[in-house]
Amino acid sequence: MRAILALEDGSVFIGSHFGATGTEVGEACFNTSMTGYQEVLTDPSYSGQIVTMTYPLIGNYGVNPEDGESGKAQVSGFVVAELAKVHSNWRATESLGPWLEKQGVIGIEGVDTRKIAKHLRSAGAMRACLTTELTPEEAVEAARNAPSMEGCNIVDKIGSHPMTPEEVDALVTGKTLPPAEYDIVAFDFGIKYNILRQLRENGFRVTVVPAHTTAEEVLAMNPDGVFLSNGPGDPATLTDIHREVAALIGKVPMFGICLGHQIISHALGAKTFKLKFGHRGANHPVKDLKTGKISITSQNHGFAVDPDTVPDDVEITLINLNDNTVEGIAHRTLPVFSVQYHPEAAPGPRDPQYLFRDFRKMIAASKRQHAR
C-alpha cells in the first residue's frame, strides 16, 4: 500500500506503508540514533511528532517488553528508509511492523530519510501529514492545517500516571536494588521509565505525582528532594506549573531533565525559544563550563533556554558544542540544577549518569545544613 509524507512547504515523499493505516498530522522531526528505535517510539516527549530515523535500516532487532519508555507508542508517525522484515534478537517478542500496527502508528518506508533530514535541517522542523488515504495535494493541505508545536500544551493531552514507590521498584528487573536512602517526589510531565529506573538504582525512593500537583501538596509529603521529568510540547505554555515549581525552589533540593529543565528555567525567571530543527539523537557533545569536560549525550528537545534571559543568580553550567545553546543551569546559592539532555541514556551514551549521584550529594548537603 502506498503511503505519503507531506510537509507544509509542499514537499511530498511517496513510499510504502507499514504499521497502521489512516491519516495523522504532527511536527516532522528527525533522529540520528543508530539504535534505540523502540525507546524513541515509546518516549512521551515525542508525542505530537512524526519522527524520521536517518539510519538506513530500522527494526532489525524487533521489539521486546523491556525497552519501552512508557506503556505504549507515543509518536504520531514513523518514517524509515527500510523496515527490517526479519528481526533477530534473543529478547525480541515480535517484529516492528506488526507491533506498530497494534499500536495504531502509521509508518512509511522506501523514502530517502537523509534527504528529509537535510531538508528539515535547512528549512526547520515543520508541520507534516502522514497518510495512506489522501492524495498528495490533500496531504499538503492537511499538514498546513495542523497545529503548530509552538504554543502547544501537550503535557495535558498525554496525561499523567502517578506511581507509588512500589510500582517504581517493579520497573527495575534483573538487579538487586540498593537501600532507598532519600524520599523524592517526581513530577510526571511524560516521564521515561529509564529515568525512574536510574533514580531508584541511585538510592531514591520515588513517588510519581501528576503534572499539576501543587507546591503545598508536595511539601505535605515532606520529600528530601523534587525531580522534574522530561515531556512534550512548548514549555512556555505551562504557566501554572512554573508558578508551583517557583514556590518549591529554596524549600527542597530540585533536579530537572529536558522539559523539567525548561520549567525550572521559567520558574527562575528565564525564557525559552523554539529551535530551528531541534536536537534529537545520541551523539550531541556538551561542555561543562566549570571543568571543561566534554560529554557525549542523548538529546530530544525542540525548545531551549534563552541565555540572554537567565537571571544573575542563575549560572549557565553546560553548553552544546554544536550550536552553543544552553544545556544546563544551576542556582548560585539554592539547591537547584537542571540539564537539557538525557543522562539516563536510553538510548545513548552513559557519560552523564553522574548527575543522578550529584542529586544525591545535593540532598545530603542540604540535610546536613538543616541539621546544624
Swiss-Prot record:
GO:BP terms for this protein? 'de novo' pyrimidine nucleobase biosynthetic process; 'de novo' UMP biosynthetic process; glutamine metabolic process; L-arginine biosynthetic process
> Which InterPro entries does the UniProt entry name for this protein?
Anth_synth/Amidotransfase, CarbamoylP_synth_ssu, CarbamoylP_synth_ssu_N, CarbP_synth_ssu_N_sf, Class_I_gatase-like, CPSase_GATase1, GATASE
Domain Glutamine amidotransferase type-1 stretches: 183-369
Cite the residue spans of the region called CPSase. 1-179
* One Pfam family linked to the record: GATase
Give the residues annotated as active site.
258, 342, 344
Q: Which of the seven top EC classes does this enzyme belong to?
A: ligase
Keywords in alphabetical order: Amino-acid biosynthesis, Arginine biosynthesis, ATP-binding, Glutamine amidotransferase, Ligase, Nucleotide-binding, Pyrimidine biosynthesis
- Annotated membrane-spanning segments are none
According to the UniProt entry, the coiled-coil residues are: none
Record-listed L-glutamine binding positions: 45, 231, 233, 259, 262, 300, 302-303
Q: In which pathway does it act?
A: Amino-acid biosynthesis; L-arginine biosynthesis; carbamoyl phosphate from bicarbonate: step 1/1; Pyrimidine metabolism; UMP biosynthesis via de novo pathway; (S)-dihydroorotate from bicarbonate: step 1/3
The molecular function terms of the Gene Ontology recorded here are: ATP binding; carbamoyl-phosphate synthase (glutamine-hydrolyzing) activity; glutaminase activity
Q: Which reactions does this protein catalyse?
A: hydrogencarbonate + L-glutamine + 2 ATP + H2O = carbamoyl phosphate + L-glutamate + 2 ADP + phosphate + 2 H(+)
EC numbers, comma separated? 6.3.5.5
Q: Assembly and partners?
A: Composed of two chains; the small (or glutamine) chain promotes the hydrolysis of glutamine to ammonia, which is used by the large (or ammonia) chain to synthesize carbamoyl phosphate. Tetramer of heterodimers (alpha,beta)4.
Family, per entry: Belongs to the CarA family.
Say what the protein does: Small subunit of the glutamine-dependent carbamoyl phosphate synthetase (CPSase). CPSase catalyzes the formation of carbamoyl phosphate from the ammonia moiety of glutamine, carbonate, and phosphate donated by ATP, constituting the first step of 2 biosynthetic pathways, one leading to arginine and/or urea and the other to pyrimidine nucleotides. The small subunit (glutamine amidotransferase) binds and cleaves glutamine to supply the large subunit with the substrate ammonia.
Q: What is this protein called?
A: Carbamoyl phosphate synthase small chain
State the species of origin.
Akkermansia muciniphila (strain ATCC BAA-835 / DSM 22959 / JCM 33894 / BCRC 81048 / CCUG 64013 / CIP 107961 / Muc)
